[in-house]
Swiss-Prot record:
PROSITE patterns: RADICAL_SAM. This is Lipoyl synthase. [4Fe-4S] cluster 2 binds at C87, C91, C94. [4Fe-4S] cluster 1 binds at C61, C66, C72, S303. It comes from Protochlamydia amoebophila (strain UWE25). The gene is lipA. Belongs to the radical SAM superfamily. Lipoyl synthase family. Its cofactor is [4Fe-4S] cluster. Its EC number is 2.8.1.8. It catalyses: [[Fe-S] cluster scaffold protein carrying a second [4Fe-4S](2+) cluster] + N(6)-octanoyl-L-lysyl-[protein] + 2 oxidized [2Fe-2S]-[ferredoxin] + 2 S-adenosyl-L-methionine + 4 H(+) = [[Fe-S] cluster scaffold protein] + N(6)-[(R)-dihydrolipoyl]-L-lysyl-[protein] + 4 Fe(3+) + 2 hydrogen sulfide + 2 5'-deoxyadenosine + 2 L-methionine + 2 reduced [2Fe-2S]-[ferredoxin]. It is found in: Cytoplasm. Keywords: 4Fe-4S, Cytoplasm, Iron, Iron-sulfur, Metal-binding, S-adenosyl-L-methionine, Transferase.
Length: 323
């Protein structure tokens, strides 16, 4: 049998992991203890939901069935999903609705996002987008309109964008970077070997190219470049190390690593529930190779506690600059 075949490849499973079926697929009926947590309390959850619904907006929290929705909405934070809720791609991990012909852009959306930011009193806002390969600029101009609308009514708000790869359109990407968000995020999602299966319309190298272009900081010297990885899809520890090295090479400064959870039965199976000790191992390795900021854990998602991530990054940078 070949050395790199799935049957012999070492998965990120510790001995106490539940229900290993023998083929690397972990039974989904029982989550390990570290994937259980208490529900948050308080009425802020309803308040956040009301603001979003009244302004006719979408969030990735809802559309992608994020496990952190209750916690984040209780903390009065949400990741706005712009350009509709229909994506022109149908990635193997994502629960957002797929459409070959997404609905036209809503030109009132930027002002409604800005109003929601104001009503929620946000200090840091995360804007993500569906892929819009049906548009000549991939939706970059609409994303910039959202950024500008937020800034017009919320001067002190910091902005993080989580974008598609714009099909490699460097001009479209430059247009977004010129809007000077504080954080530019584009997720690599998985290791090189698994990319064709996990993100069939994206490529590993294109993602690195997008991040590298952003890391040049041509328009905004204080821009921080961020990317995220899902684990539990069948990758090995060595492949995660290689991916972290690639992210470091192209200038990525913030990396998030979290557990993949199957959003519905049509999507990719979970191959392993990764133990918290392994997440700590990834964090320590990333720091050892010079990535300044890593946030790794079972419930970590690319925009999870994004305001705290930016605050800690700025604090660490200030300490380094003062030495």
């Amino acid at each position: 049998m070949m050395e790199n075949s799935p049957k012999t490849r070492r998965l990120n499973i510790l001995p106490d992991n539940p229900e290993n079926t023998g083929d690397g697929v972990v039974g989904l009926g029982r989550f390990p203890s570290w994937l259980h947590r208490p529900l948050p309390k308080g009425n802020q959850l309803q308040i956040t939901g009301q603001v979003i619904n009244q302004n006719r907006l979408h969030t990735v929290c809802e559309e992608a069935k994020c496990p952190n929705l209750l916690e984040c909405w209780t903390k009065k934070t949400a990741t706005f999903l712009v350009m509709g809720k229909e994506c022109s791609r149908n990635c193997g991990f994502c629960d957002i609705d797929f459409s070959k012909n997404p609905k036209p852009l809503d030109r009132s959306e930027p002002s409604r996002v800005a109003l929601s930011v104001q009503q929620l009193g946000l200090k840091h806002v995360v804007i993500t987008m569906v892929a819009r390969d049906d548009l000549s600029d991939g939706g970059s101009s609409h994303l910039v309109e959202v950024i500008e609308a937020i800034r017009q009514t919320n001067e002190d708000v910091t902005i993080e964008v989580l974008t598609s790869d714009f099909e490699g359109n460097r001009k479209a990407l430059s247009f977004v970077l010129q809007a000077k968000p504080e954080i530019f995020n584009h997720n690599i999602e998985t290791v090189r070997r698994l990319t064709p299966r996990v993100r069939h319309k994206a490529t590993y190298e294109r993602t690195l190219s997008v991040l590298e272009q952003a890391a040049q900081k041509k328009y905004h010297s204080q821009l921080k470049v961020k990317s995220g990885i899902m684990v539990g899809l069948g990758e090995t520890e060595e492949e995660i190390f290689e991916t972290l090295l690639d992210l470091k090479r192209v200038g990525c400064e913030i990396v998030t690593i979290g557990q993949y959870l199957q959003p519905n039965r049509q999507k990719l199976l979970v191959k392993s529930f990764v133990h918290p000790d392994i997440f700590k191992k990834y964090e320590q390795y990333g720091l050892s190779i010079g990535i300044p900021h890593l946030y790794c854990g079972p419930f970590v998602r690319s925009s999870y506690n994004a305001n705290l991530v930016l605050m800690r990054a700025n604090q660490k940078e200030a300490i380094v600059n003062s030495e």
